[in-house]
């Protein structure tokens, strides 16, 4: 009996071993990744956990589709074009002297950093000088070169200076805009011996009619300025004749171009004008004190200085035996 069992066992043993080996090999093979089947709920969760019903109708709806937000593109409105930047017209009287080119160079270096500025340079001469012509050609600035001589009788000490030159600049502006619609612009008188902060040009560009601000190193004081209360000019802090209608320096105001064009007879006067009264005589023709627009933080910041170049000492300049090279200074 036992021998029969052992014989059957040994007959089945190889087959059992083969089955075990096959099962072991099959279990060692990497199982394919399980791909979860998508589940579409008939309800979608909205903000705050609220359950939203499915969308019905429309090309994107269908059985098994949940609610989804469509990001439909809408045409954007075109931005409005920015208004043109007002042009600043700077009228600069100048005359021949040893420091002329140095003064103009300093001024040009400032103007070159100001956007939309047109320089009107007016020589006190019967003709344009080669020095100024060459200088403007290399200055890299939009400019106009004018000339008009001061009559000999008005060159005496104590009389107003640069009257004819400023009037020539005003006449050029009016003639240029006579037959065309004037673009926004601002005019100011920039003497070639002044020093300007770039912030001043930002302030004056928003001038509606006539704007004013302090001036440093003028009138025998560290500064002069309009006195302002509640945004209005009520007086003048000045070291000379505070009774003037406009006790202000030529470097202390700017005028809208439209005001200049609307007052074609407004000029600087020779007859009847007293020394130091040119600013008042001019401004009386175009505005009143009540209409003045204070700039520079209600006229509490100095952004322009009435600097003066020291008189040059040329005592050692030779009259004979000159340099063999002619150099422009």
UniProtKB/Swiss-Prot annotation:
Molecular function per GO: galactosylgalactosylxylosylprotein 3-beta-glucuronosyltransferase activity; metal ion binding
Regions crossing the membrane: 3-23
Topological domains, Cytoplasmic: 1-2
Active site location: 279 (proton donor/acceptor)
Basic and acidic residues biased stretches: 66-81
Lumenal compartment segments: 24-329
Residue positions binding UDP-alpha-D-glucuronate: 93-95, 124, 161, 166, 191-193, 306-308
Entry GO CC: Golgi membrane
Keyword Amino-acid biosynthesis tagged: no
Binding-site residues, Mn(2+): 193
Catalytic activity: 3-O-(beta-D-galactosyl-(1->3)-beta-D-galactosyl-(1->4)-beta-D-xylosyl)-L-seryl-[protein] + UDP-alpha-D-glucuronate = 3-O-(beta-D-GlcA-(1->3)-beta-D-Gal-(1->3)-beta-D-Gal-(1->4)-beta-D-Xyl)-L-seryl-[protein] + UDP + H(+)
EC nos: 2.4.1.135
Residues with glycosylation annotation: 71, 298
Residue numbers marked as site, Interaction with galactose moiety of substrate glycoprotein: 224, 316
Region (Disordered), start-end ranges: 45-87
PANTHER family, sorted: GALACTOSYLGALACTOSYLXYLOSYLPROTEIN 3-BETA-GLUCURONOSYLTRANSFERASE 2, GALACTOSYLGALACTOSYLXYLOSYLPROTEIN 3-BETA-GLUCURONOSYLTRANSFERASE BETA-1,3-GLUCURONYLTRANSFERASE
Protein name (Swiss-Prot/TrEMBL): Galactosylgalactosylxylosylprotein 3-beta-glucuronosyltransferase 2
Organism: Canis lupus familiaris (Dog)
């Amino acid at each position: 009996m036992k021998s029969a069992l052992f014989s059957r066992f040994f007959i089945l043993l190889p087959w059992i071993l083969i089955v075990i080996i096959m099962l072991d090999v099959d279990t060692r093979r990497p199982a394919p990744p399980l791909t979860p089947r998508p589940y579409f709920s008939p309800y979608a969760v909205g903000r705050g956990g609220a359950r939203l019903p499915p969308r019905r109708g429309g090309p994107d709806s269908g059985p098994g589709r949940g609610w989804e937000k469509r990001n439909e593109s809408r045409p954007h409105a075109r931005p409005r074009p920015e208004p043109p930047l007002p042009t600043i017209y700077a009228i600069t009287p100048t005359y021949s002297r040893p420091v002329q080119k140095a003064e103009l160079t300093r001024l040009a270096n400032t103007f070159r950093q100001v956007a939309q500025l047109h320089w009107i340079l007016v020589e006190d001469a019967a003709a344009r000088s080669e020095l100024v012509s060459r200088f403007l050609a290399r200055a890299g600035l939009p400019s106009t070169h004018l000339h008009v001589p001061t009559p000999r009788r008005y060159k005496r000490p104590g009389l107003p200076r640069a009257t004819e030159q400023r009037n020539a600049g005003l006449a050029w502006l009016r003639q240029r805009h006579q037959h065309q619609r004037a673009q926004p612009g601002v005019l100011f008188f920039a003497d070639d011996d002044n020093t300007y902060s770039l912030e001043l040009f930002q302030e004056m560009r928003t001038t509606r009619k006539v704007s004013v601000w302090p001036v440093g190193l003028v009138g025998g004081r560290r500064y002069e300025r309009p006195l302002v209360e509640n945004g209005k000019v009520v007086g003048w802090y000045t070291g000379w004749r505070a009774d003037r209608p406009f006790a202000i320096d030529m470097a202390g105001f700017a005028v809208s171009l439209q005001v200049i064009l609307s007052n074609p007879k407004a000029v600087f006067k020779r007859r009847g004008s007293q020394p130091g009264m040119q600013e008042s005589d001019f401004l009386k023709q175009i505005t009143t004190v009540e209409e003045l627009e204070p700039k520079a933080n209600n006229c509490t910041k100095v952004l322009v200085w009435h600097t003066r170049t020291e008189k040059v000492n040329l005592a050692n300049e030779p009259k004979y035996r000159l340099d063999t090279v002619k150099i422009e200074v």
